[in-house]
């Protein structure tokens, strides 16, 4: 039997906690036998003293085991259970293509996703722009969709990693969110509860990233890869660029439209293509569906070219109560904003920098995201035809097309876009889309 205050004291004094102590504390968070003050105190001691790798693995597994852990054995699936997690960005619509692409190559992708947070868009919010789309199918239905379609993207239910919800709520109000062991456990507890064989982590770097510096993004990626592999799930991470909007669009319906166009081959933004392919390659190799990079790329290109990936996306939408002909008629189903017009720079020049976070917040301000959980979302608003770093803009080439609910909202967004995009008289050096691959 342990005492919560003795566990806090031990960590406060700089000692490592045992697996049993960590499990006792996490189960107490779940069972409400540990107070908010005690959670805050432990979070702060971890913030200042860090955690060893064994402690990090124990914390993550205890949080994972605080609720249901999915088990797929009874379905006798003929392929690996694989998933991807992103630290979030703007125009980061990779999940909507990646899930169907990997499923079309023989993987099974039970993606439990999130809503928008701060300036970053949420995959669930994007999917809810599709009429009727059900992000909370019951457990049996979720399993059926995975077996039949190969991919489902759903919301987190209260049975998955329940200790994380309470732990996170306390961290949020006690300035202990930005601790790498706590971030790692929070992310992985939910992902590992999916019962995965393999995971790829997309850790963003740059002006729209969750972590403020390249070094901290790399440290988070290394921590996640170390802990997930320590917990028995083959995991790699990619550090990818978020110094500009990833897709050509940012918003909800506008990003779904771009995802469908990507899958059907109508339009593929080159940077979005690079990141999506790189993440899919990791999933195929870690899931043992491909031996190496070249084989993985060939398989992925084939399911894009032969229409299989687009077909899987359509089947997923239909299975989750969306329209059965969504891929063919997406424009008919997706909401469009009242006002769509381009915004131009006041001077001409090359785009040298973008405050991606500010662009994400501009979408939120237009109604495309939530400032608090109770807010409703306007799925139709956002940006399309986003200019990229290095582009030359003038009176002919706009910075973006803004989709807004009225003139006032358009003006506010136009001001935000102009302020977020910096021009120079010479083209900047273009940063890579994928900086680094982390395997241990």
Swiss-Prot record:
Q: Which GO terms describe its cellular component?
A: cytosol
> Any idea which UniProt keywords this protein has?
Glycosyltransferase, Transferase
Molecular function (GO) terms for this protein are: 1,4-alpha-oligoglucan phosphorylase activity; thymidine phosphorylase activity
Q: Which reaction does it catalyse?
A: thymidine + phosphate = 2-deoxy-alpha-D-ribose 1-phosphate + thymine
Question: What Enzyme Commission number does this protein have?
Answer: 2.4.2.4
Q: Which domain of life is it from?
A: Bacteria
**TM spans (from-to):** none
Annotated GO biological process: pyrimidine nucleobase metabolic process; thymidine metabolic process
Q: In which pathway does this enzyme or protein participate?
A: Pyrimidine metabolism; dTMP biosynthesis via salvage pathway; dTMP from thymine: step 1/2
The answer to whether UniProt assigns keyword Transport to this entry is no
| Known function | The enzymes which catalyze the reversible phosphorolysis of pyrimidine nucleosides are involved in the degradation of these compounds and in their utilization as carbon and energy sources, or in the rescue of pyrimidine bases for nucleotide synthesis.
User: What do we know about how this protein assembles, alone or with others?
Assistant: Homodimer.
Tell me which HAMAP family the record gives. Answer: Thymid_phosp
Protein name per UniProt: Thymidine phosphorylase
């Amino acid at each position: 039997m342990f005492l919560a205050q003795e566990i806090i004291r031990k960590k406060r004094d700089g000692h490592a906690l045992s697996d049993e102590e960590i499990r006792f504390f996490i189960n107490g968070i779940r069972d409400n036998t540990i107070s908010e003050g005690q959670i805050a105190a432990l979070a702060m001691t971890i913030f200042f003293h860090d955690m060893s790798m064994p402690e990090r693995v124990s914390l993550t597994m205890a949080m994972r085991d605080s609720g249901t852990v999915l088990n797929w054995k009874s379905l006798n699936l003929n392929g690996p259970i694989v998933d991807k997690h992103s630290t979030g960005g703007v125009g980061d619509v990779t999940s909507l293509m990646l899930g169907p692409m990997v499923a079309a190559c023989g993987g099974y992708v039970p993606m439990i996703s999130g809503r928008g947070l701060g300036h970053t868009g949420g995959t669930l919010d994007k999917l809810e722009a599709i009429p009727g789309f059900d992000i909370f199918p019951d457990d049996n239905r979720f399993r059926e969709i995975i077996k039949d379609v190969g991919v489902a993207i759903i919301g987190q239910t209260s049975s998955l990693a329940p200790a994380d919800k309470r732990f996170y709520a306390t961290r949020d109000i006690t300035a202990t969110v930005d601790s790498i062991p706590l971030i790692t456990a929070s992310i992985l507890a939910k992902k590992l509860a999916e019962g995965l064989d393999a995971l790829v982590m997309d850790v963003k770097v740059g002006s729209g990233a969750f972590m403020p510096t390249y070094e901290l993004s790399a440290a988070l990626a290394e921590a996640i890869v170390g802990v997930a592999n320590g917990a028995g799930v083959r995991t790699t991470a990619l550090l990818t660029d978020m110094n500009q909007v990833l897709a050509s669009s940012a918003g909800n319906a506008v990003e779904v439209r771009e995802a469908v166009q990507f899958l059907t081959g109508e339009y593929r933004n080159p940077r979005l293509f690079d990141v999506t392919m790189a993440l899919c390659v990791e999933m195929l190799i870690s899931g043992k569906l491909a031996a190496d990079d070249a084989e993985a790329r060939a398989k992925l290109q084939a399911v894009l070219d032969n229409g299989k990936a687009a077909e899987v996306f359509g089947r997923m939408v239909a299975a989750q109560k969306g329209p059965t002909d969504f891929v063919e008629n997406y424009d008919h189903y997706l909401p469009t904003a009242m006002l769509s017009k381009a915004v131009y720079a006041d001077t001409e020049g090359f785009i040298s920098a973008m405050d991606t976070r500010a662009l994400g917040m501009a979408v939120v301000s237009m109604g495309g995201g939530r400032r608090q959980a109770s807010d409703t979302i306007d799925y139709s608003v956002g940006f399309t035809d986003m200019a990229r770093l290095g582009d030359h803009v003038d009176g002919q080439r706009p910075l973006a097309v803004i989709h807004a609910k009225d003139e006032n909202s358009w003006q506010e967004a136009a001001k935000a876009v102009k302020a977020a995009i910096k021009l120079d008289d010479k083209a900047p050096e273009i940063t890579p889309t994928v900086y680094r691959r982390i395997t241990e």
